[in-house]
Amino acid sequence: MSPETNHDLVARLAARLGPAGLLTAESDVAPYAVDWRRLFPGRPACVARPASTGEVAEVVRLCREAGAAIVPQGGNTGLAGGAAPDRSGTQVVLSLGRMAAIRAVDPVGLTLTAEAGCVLRTAQDAAAAVNRVLPISFAAEGSAMVGGVVATNAGGLNVVRHGMTRANVLGLEVVLADGSVVAGLRALRKDNAGYDWKQLFVGSEGTLGVITAAVLRLSARPRHVATALLAVPDPEAALRLFTLAQDELGEAIQAFELISGLSLALVARHGGPRNPLGPSPWYVLVEAASSLPALREAAEAVLGAALEQGDAQDGVLAESGQQAAGLWALREGITEAEAKEGRGVKHDVSVPIAAIPAFLAAADRALADKLPGARPNAFGHMGDGNIHYNVLATADQAGEAVNAVVHDVVEAFGGSISAEHGIGQYRAAELVRRRTPEEIALARRIKAALDPEGLLNPGKVLPL
């Protein structure tokens, strides 16, 4: 796009959106120009901030006429650089932040309809106000927006019970690359009429269309919650504990987290909350929720059995909501503690649940063999197979080399290089290396069909 075309596009966007709807000053644009991890600094032509679906469609049409690429952006909390513009100065960031309305809450049908710019926690609060739960939950829920949550198919803490975001989306409203609007906000649990097209856009990271609203599934609010932290000797014991918890607590399990001893040592070293248990090679944080009154007794039975058979060496069952929050604060403090510890190479991987102990052992061996001095730090959602196998690398160990070692092991176990964070630009080239040529060809055919000019979030998911 030439400078003249660029200038003309900015002028036309300003005329359509007004002063509140377009940012051009460098200081105003700066927060939108770089990803949350600050790995991909960009320089957009401007930031468009439409306030309605109609305005989103108009922005898309104007950008298409000018041949300008569009980078949809919500809360900009993603960890793969999927919402960051490039440095060309020609891309338009399309921020959905002004579209923040909750359009409907149905406590009987258990649905909530929210616009793309609605912050996830705001949607959770709206559900709670009618004694319901929006089960999508993760660390960035106070900043992440519904559109980005859906576009990245976000995971989080409750996937073991409620599934990924994909499983909780009933309907979508999407603006396509030509500016047309597909309105599919049907709040139906059963709808078998034709192709389920909405699932193409869930997890597409803004490369196939711009999500402007979503119908999300709610759940009944459980009356009782049981949260426990257990010290376990190894991942094999944690896996046996998971099986025990499934047998005794069944569908009440809503979180089952595996945490390395190094993780909580880092939390303690950098001023985090106190660990109520003694030092241990590994820990498990498990939470169950139910409206049945016998939940606590069942949780106590699981804890007692784990201690008796030696799969847990110590444990604490929270006596109050405040104590449960303290246990979760340990888990949530790991990322910040890692950042304070120094340079880390992060991995968001998944393998079959039963293979987690063998995967961890194999990855540790591969790192020790090929990158001596690198320190692996594993934690994550054992209950759904998702492990954040992060590596505290030495100064001379390139991130690409670390990724190659870890992803080779992931591939050997039939796993995925991205369990919940998405591909973005951080993993786009790696995705092509790790998927079959037929899978990549199919993805490119879908992209070409829905975005033939390649103007929607180019370079994300699929490399240019």
Predicted regions and their residues:
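Noncatalytic alpha-helical scaffold of FAD-dependent oxidoreductases
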Residues: 1-464
